[in-house]
Amino acid sequence: PYIGDQSYFDTTYKGLQLVQQELGDKVETKLIEMGTDAAGWDTAYRQAADDGYQIIISGNFQYESYMLAVAEEHPEIKFLNFDYSDAKANSLDNVYSITYAANEAGYLAGVVAGVKTESGIVGCIGGVDSPGIRQFLAGYMQGVYDVNPNAKVISGFVGGFGDPATAKEIALNMHKQGADVIYHAAGGSGNGLFEAAAEANFWAIGVDADQYASMSGKPELAKHILTSSEKKCDVAILQSIKLMLDGKAEYGTQKTLGFVDGAVGLAENENYKANMTADQLAKVEEMKKKLAAGEIKVNDQLKDDKAYDTWLDKVGLK
């Protein structure tokens, strides 16, 4: 839908670039930026359909209904919906839907926060209060608890994905309450968390992409990004397009990709390794192995709509 958020959508754009690089002899690709103004989204999808594209790639719950409306009217066009939210609505014969286990991504971030905190208080910030974002945060709280059951969590929502000023204000307030590690699942708003972390000297955890790397142009901010939970949208998009081109995509179905699939994980870059002790790194590795082996079942907000509230009641700072 657009690029420049240094997170989710930039990673998905890398997926389109991978498609062009690896499959350029079979396909021609084009990026269409729809922006953040919903007034133009329907027109953008219809224009793409009218322009004769055989496959349209789109994702994110905010855009989903617009894409599906056009998909229903154009059965001759194939659609890849990455990060779907409504399984029933995606059961169209020309739509292949994938999503990522955001609960597992959040869980891994929570494990890091739980072993890293010195104050025993950590935070998490969501972009909007939606099931998909609550899925990240509920997983985060479970991860914190599993490695540090006495830790407390402060949670809050920005109200949008393009409001770093509000995210910064929320993060600074959390830090004043004692949070020394704060995670975000807030898209472009999360840049405000990084500003707060640099200003008040605490640790931030990014989302969807290696945000330490994506913020490398601002080293004063990047050095406070301990790690990021990653949705490896780029690889998943490339794999999905290959299936579609080979006629192997299961249209009308929805596939969830998790840690065991290599679709979500942690950014274990030099900043992460330099600022975690050997014991902390070992604990994270232990929990990753348990998750991969199926020994840990992460709560799923999309299957249990009380998961976030249950965990906040259990570990929330009173």
Please provide the spans of the model-predicted regions:
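A residue-level marker of the well-folded mature domains of exported/periplasmic proteins
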Residues: 1-318
